[in-house]
Amino acid sequence: MHILKKPDLSDPKMRAKLAKGMGHNYYGEPAWPNDLLYIFPVVILGTIACIVGLAVLDPAMLADKADPFATPLEILPEWYLYPVFQILRVVPNKLLGIALQTLVPLGLMLVPFIESFNKFQNPFRRPVAMTVFLFGTVTTIYLGIGAALPIDKSLTLGLF
């Protein structure tokens, strides 16, 4: 079974249709009823079966019960807040930490305007956007790993 069904461009009937402007909607396999009635339910049921199977085979364990008289030394936020928590924890001036928090979304809003002259959609042909994306990804991972470590090892990640 082929994943992509390519049109036969050597067929004179197909070339005549394409010359009239009849595009991809006039050849190939129709979405109704083939995809919507047969393929989508199989994918949905397979996804549900995988989720239920993983939940049954490896259930999530509950953590220790809360003890109000024994608080941990350092309370960490949820994992997705680790990078911003690390910024607030490392920056000495808290106002500067809040300002850095506002610079992140402002910087993300500027990215489309930086490279608006580039007509390519291929990420490898958009060097500015790729550089900003890779720098942001590496910085976020670095800050996230550092937030999980104690404060004295958080900047060097315990390597130095």
Swiss-Prot record:
UniProt-listed InterPro entries: Cyt_b/b6_C, Cyt_b/b6_C_sf, Cyt_b6/f_cplx_suIV, Cytochrome_b_C_euk/bac
SUPFAM superfamilies: a domain/subunit of cytochrome bc1 complex (Ubiquinol-cytochrome c reductase)
Single GO MF annotation: ubiquinol-cytochrome-c reductase activity
GO cellular component terms, A-Z: plasma membrane-derived thylakoid membrane
Mode of membrane association: Multi-pass membrane protein
Subcellular location: Cellular thylakoid membrane
Record has Transmembrane as a keyword: yes
UniProt GO BP: photosynthetic electron transport chain
One Pfam family linked to the record: Cytochrom_B_C
Keywords: Electron transport, Membrane, Photosynthesis, Thylakoid, Transmembrane, Transmembrane helix, Transport
Transmembrane segments: 36-56, 95-115, 131-151
Quaternary data: The 4 large subunits of the cytochrome b6-f complex are cytochrome b6, subunit IV (17 kDa polypeptide, PetD), cytochrome f and the Rieske protein, while the 4 small subunits are PetG, PetL, PetM and PetN. The complex functions as a dimer.
Family listed: Belongs to the cytochrome b family. PetD subfamily.
PANTHER family according to UniProt: CYTOCHROME B, CYTOCHROME B_B6 C-TERMINAL REGION PROFILE DOMAIN-CONTAINING PROTEIN
Function: Component of the cytochrome b6-f complex, which mediates electron transfer between photosystem II (PSII) and photosystem I (PSI), cyclic electron flow around PSI, and state transitions.
Protein's recorded name: Cytochrome b6-f complex subunit 4
Organism from which the protein derives: Parasynechococcus marenigrum (strain WH8102)
Lineage: Bacteria, Bacillati, Cyanobacteriota, Cyanophyceae, Synechococcales
